[in-house]
């Protein structure tokens, strides 16, 4: 059985926590996040720690307990440190350019692809083939990075496409022919 939900969340200096029913507001140096807790789960602030609790040991409540604790912890880390996903582009002629807050990709299609930065997300381009997606909301950063990766998924035969930094792509051998 996982015991993630039982661990208290340390609240660093400069972070304000406000609990209003099932909604936990986390305010820090980088911004403000709001986490809505699942129905039976409750949270309380005690001695610079957030404690998440469940009413009973029902199977569903145990699962939601760990989830709620992780969501609140992600919000605390997000407003203090933030989250970043680094990505690389591989392939001849594949590149990315920053246009203001947005990104413009050239990925071998007949047209360039423009990605607008959602609110709370910032893009940074390093050279023509490296980029990073940053923000305070872990879920939104991962979602935007996954959308960008989906524009041109890594090809297992040629190794061309967009991948996360450090991601290992399983290469396949092509047909041998006669």
UniProtKB/Swiss-Prot annotation:
Disulfide bond residue pairs: none
Listed SUPFAM superfamilies: Ribosomal protein L6 (SSF56053)
Keyword tags: Ribonucleoprotein, Ribosomal protein, RNA-binding, rRNA-binding
GO biological process, one term: cytoplasmic translation
Top-level taxon in the UniProt lineage: Bacteria
Coiled coil: none
GO molecular function: rRNA binding; structural constituent of ribosome
Signal sequence region: none
One Gene Ontology CC term in the entry: cytosolic large ribosomal subunit
HAMAP family xref list: Ribosomal_uL6_B
Assembly behavior: Part of the 50S ribosomal subunit.
Family: Belongs to the universal ribosomal protein uL6 family.
Primary role: This protein binds to the 23S rRNA, and is important in its secondary structure. It is located near the subunit interface in the base of the L7/L12 stalk, and near the tRNA binding site of the peptidyltransferase center.
Name of the molecule in the record: Large ribosomal subunit protein uL6
Organism: Corynebacterium aurimucosum (strain ATCC 700975 / DSM 44827 / CIP 107346 / CN-1) (Corynebacterium nigricans)
The organism's taxonomic lineage, starting at the top: Bacteria, Bacillati, Actinomycetota, Actinomycetes, Mycobacteriales
């Amino acid at each position: 059985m996982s015991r993630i939900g039982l661990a208290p969340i340390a609240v660093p200096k400069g972070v304000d926590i406000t609990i209003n029913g099932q909604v936990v507001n986390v305010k820090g140096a980088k911004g403000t996040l709001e986490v809505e807790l699942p129905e039976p789960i409750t949270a309380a602030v005690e001695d610079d720690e957030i404690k998440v609790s469940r009413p009973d040991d029902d199977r569903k409540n145990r699962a939601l307990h760990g989830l709620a604790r992780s969501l609140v912890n992600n919000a605390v880390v997000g407003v203090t440190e933030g989250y970043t996903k680094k990505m690389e582009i591989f392939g001849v002629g594949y590149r990315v350019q920053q246009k203001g807050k947005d990104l413009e990709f050239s990925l071998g299609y007949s047209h360039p692809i423009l990605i607008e930065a959602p609110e709370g997300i910032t893009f940074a381009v390093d050279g023509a083939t490296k980029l990073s997606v940053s923000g305070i909301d872990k879920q939104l950063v991962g979602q935007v990075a996954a959308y960008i990766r989906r524009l041109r998924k890594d090809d297992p035969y040629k190794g061309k496409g967009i991948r996360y930094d450090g991601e290992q792509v399983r290469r396949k051998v092509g047909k041998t022919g006669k």
